[in-house]
Amino acid sequence: MNVHEFQAKGILSGFDVRVPKGVVVRSVEEVDSALGSLAAGIVAVKAQIHAGGRGKAGGVKIGKAREEVADLVKSMLGSVLVTHQTSAAGQKVHAVYLEEGVSIKKEYYLGAVVDRKAGMVSVIFSSEGGMDIEEVAHSRPEMVVVVNVDPVYGFLDFHGRKLCYGLGLKKEQVVQITAMARKVCRALMETDASQVEINPLVETTCGEFIALDAKMTFDDNGLFRRPEIVKLTDPHEYSEEELEAAKYGLSYIKLDGNIGCMVNGAGLAMATMDIVKYYGGEPANFLDVGGGASKDTVREAFKIILRSGVDGILVNIFGGIMRCDVIAAGIIESAKEIGVSVPMVVRLSGTNYKIGKEMLDASGLSIVTAENLDEAARFVVDLVGKRG
């Protein structure tokens, strides 16, 4: 789950991370009141969407006079931002964050992410702030320092020294960066976040460090114990299909392609999308029905896939916990009830897969069965190509 910048800053400020004062507005009429609570001077006007790259897309501007800020807010609200992190359709702006300007001396990057392989929290620090950290790590790896933090002990002073001295910072800077990194680490661990990113973390001309931008991503599996985080969900940032999928416990992400994919297991779902693209197709979605899918779940999954106007459907199921014959029955019932009119290819493997395949072949429906994933991907891409 993602949250907006102003929400991430609200969370981080609760951990004593210093952020500029700001107010979120959702209409031009709110601008006067918002500016009245901010210090006079320049104001950063920031479109709030769940994607990075806003600045390059025109989603971050600087205003001074009230009229200028109001005009910027008016131009942003309702506009669609297309960045390198959005789909081609972009994301519509429903809220704008007005923030007091900061006198910047130097920009840094500070982030924390769960390293599942190491079983630790990786804290990343760079003296090249305001840029894509992956790009910096690729082009100038010497400017990025990473330390692994054991969540049992938390962020310790020696971690901070390693981060800062590796980039040649001064003693007074080390003290502040160490304190900031410790707070970021705590925020990640105590909110079940999977990522916290401050980019840029700025050093002001007064020598203070402030989070000028913030991003937080939360582990969906931990949300059941974080109701305060769930309340921050912005339905505007999700498609109708994604909201509907959440009601039935389905993991769904809408993509830009035309081949709908229904798979059980996130890893298998990603592999399925990869092989569809390998054969020249374009996945329309990521859809994981989970390990305990029922007939009802399969039916709702079909409805969600078809709602997005796909030209073909690929069902790839591995029967471990679930039985392939139960899935086959759900596919048949759903296809008859909904009336699937696009080509459908089904690949079943695992528990009772032979029974499931026989049920599909005997259903009288236009369902193509495949022996393996490679064959299934080729079939669906060919069928969609012929149809188009």
Swiss-Prot record:
- Copy out the cofactor comment: Binds 1 Mg(2+) ion per subunit.
- Extract the Pfam families matched here: ATP-grasp_2 (PF08442), Ligase_CoA (PF00549)
Q: Name one GO molecular function term.
A: succinate-CoA ligase (ADP-forming) activity
User: What InterPro entries does this protein map onto?
Assistant: ATP-grasp_succ-CoA_synth-type, ATP_grasp_subdomain_1, Succ-CoA_synthase_bsu_CS, SUCC_ACL_C, Succ_CoA_ligase-like_bsu, Succinyl-CoA_synth-like
Q: Could you mention a single GO BP entry for this protein?
A: tricarboxylic acid cycle
GO cellular component terms, semicolon-separated = cytosol; succinate-CoA ligase complex
Chain sites annotated for binding ATP:
46, 53-55, 99, 102, 107
Per UniProt, substrate binds at: 264, 320-322
Keyword tags: ATP-binding, Ligase, Magnesium, Metal-binding, Nucleotide-binding, Tricarboxylic acid cycle
Binding residues for Mg(2+): 199, 213
Write the Enzyme Commission number(s) for this entry. Answer: 6.2.1.5
Required cofactor names: Mg(2+)
Taxonomy, superkingdom: Bacteria
Per the entry, what this protein does is:
Succinyl-CoA synthetase functions in the citric acid cycle (TCA), coupling the hydrolysis of succinyl-CoA to the synthesis of either ATP or GTP and thus represents the only step of substrate-level phosphorylation in the TCA. The beta subunit provides nucleotide specificity of the enzyme and binds the substrate succinate, while the binding sites for coenzyme A and phosphate are found in the alpha subunit.
What does the similarity note say?
A: Belongs to the succinate/malate CoA ligase beta subunit family.
> What protein does this entry describe?
Succinate--CoA ligase [ADP-forming] subunit beta
Gene that encodes it: sucC
